[in-house]
A protein has these predicted regions:
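Transmembrane alpha-helical segments in multi-pass inner-membrane proteins
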Residues: 248, 258-324
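Membrane-interfacial amphipathic/re-entrant helices at transmembrane-helix boundaries
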Residues: 3-72, 107-120, 185
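Hydrophobic alpha-helical transmembrane segments
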Residues: 31-36, 61, 68-69, 90-94, ...
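Transmembrane helix-bundle core of multi-pass membrane transporters
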Residues: 143, 147-210, 236-239, 257-268, ...
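Cytosolic-side transmembrane-helix boundaries in multi-pass membrane proteins
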Residues: 1-41, 228, 232-235, 307-341
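Helix-loop-helix "hairpin" substructures at the membrane interface of multi-pass membrane proteins
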Residues: 117-125, 131-136, 140, 188-262
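Membrane-embedded helix boundary and interhelical linker motif in transport proteins
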Residues: 80-135
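Hydrophobic core segments of alpha-helical transmembrane domains in multi-pass membrane transport
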Residues: 34-46, 75, 126-129, 158-160, ...
Length: 341
């Protein structure tokens, strides 16, 4: 009997050691897994295609990622509070069309006797995005409309407003000052990449170093406890949708400036890419858990994947399948972590 106990002890100790090793690896994989995946993907693509690591291609990847990255950062604020914003793609189109129309008409003397201010169209585009986000936030926070329903309605409404405002036609011939935000550069670095980096830095600071950021996590972690502790849950929820709308407005102007015309059909399904970047980056759809840095890495992973598949000649249809699989896998991983806890 004693021998059986002694014989069983090493096996138990081994299991304990294996559990300890798993516990050690788990947090590391959870925190840096997406970054490791991005690095591995870059290494594989650089081996398969020698043009992948060229400076021109890297700049191209970052430029293409900037729009989705900006949208995803705004989406992160919303998802951290247990919300969702399905309207960002339509807001991209609306902000682009409205701001571009002012960039064109102001320059051609649409406002008699008024000087043309290069910043005016940008301010109008930003305000348009904030207004759309604020309306969604009002519906969610003040009238308790489910976020999915409120933003789905805004998706349709904003797209309709875009078509009405533009007459269903693109708005071309933008001024050089407006196009600079999409095609210009500073010290050789494209402006969209710089804006993406600045928005990331500011958002990271807000979420990690400010009271508002702590309140966002508190509302997402436990809304009832946050309310009991004196936090204005409705104001926080309203604010995050306004932030998402503002960043969608910026993304819309960058897109219009880069393409040289504002298309009323722009931004279709952009919300899916943004949600994918957030979820792949480790932010929980249940709220309260996530980081902007993870979202940025998630956006980069999607951008690198799309670019790599393009270089390999893979059709875009397959890219959508892979992207969908990544989203499902990321959600399954998040659910499994919660089950273990």
């Amino acid at each position: 009997m004693k021998e059986q106990v002694k014989a069983a002890t090493p096996a138990g100790a081994g299991a304990e050691q294996r559990q300890t090793l798993s516990e050690r690896i788990g947090p590391v994989a959870q925190r840096y897994g997406i970054l490791i995946a991005l690095i591995v993907l870059c290494v594989v693509l650089s081996v398969v295609n020698e043009n992948f690591l060229s400076s021109r291609n890297i700049i191209n990847v970052l430029r293409q990622t900037s729009i989705n990255g900006i949208l995803a950062i705004g989406m992160t604020f919303v998802i951290l509070t247990r919300g969702i914003d399905l309207s960002v793609g339509s807001v991209v189109a609306l902000a682009g069309v409205v701001s571009a129309s002012f960039a064109t008409t102001s320059a051609s003397g649409f406002i008699p006797g008024a000087p043309y201010f290069a910043l005016l169209p940008l301010v109008i585009g930003l305000v348009t995005g904030i207004a759309m986000g604020a309306l969604s936030g009002l519906a969610v926070a003040r009238y308790a409309v489910p976020a999915f329903v409120a933003t789905l309605g805004m998706l349709s409404a904003a797209r309709g407003l875009t078509l009405i405002y533009s007459g269903g036609r693109p708005i071309p011939a933008l001024t050089d000052g407006y196009r600079w935000i999409g095609t210009g550069d500073i010290a050789g670095i494209p402006v969209p990449i710089i804006l993406f980096a600045l928005i990331f830095g500011l958002s990271h600071f807000v979420l990690t170093r400010t009271r508002f950021g702590r309140h966002v996590y508190a509302v997402g972690g436990n809304p009832h406890a946050a309310k009991v502790s004196g936090l204005s849950v409705n104001r926080i929820r309203f604010a995050v949708y306004a932030i998402s709308g503002a960043l969608a407005g910026i993304a819309g102007m960058i897109l219009a400036a880069r393409t040289g015309s504002a298309l009323p059909q722009a931004g279709v399904a952009y919300e899916l890419d943004a949600i994918a970047a957030v979820v792949i980056g480790g932010t929980s759809l249940s709220g309260g858990i996530g980081r902007v840095s993870g979202t940025v890495i998630g956006a980069l992973l999607i951008g690198v994947m799309n670019n790599g598949l393009d270089l390999l000649g893979v059709e875009s249809y397959y890219q959508q399948v892979i992207k969908g699989a990544l989203i499902v896998a990321a959600v399954m991983l998040d659910r499994s972590r919660k089950t273990e806890l």
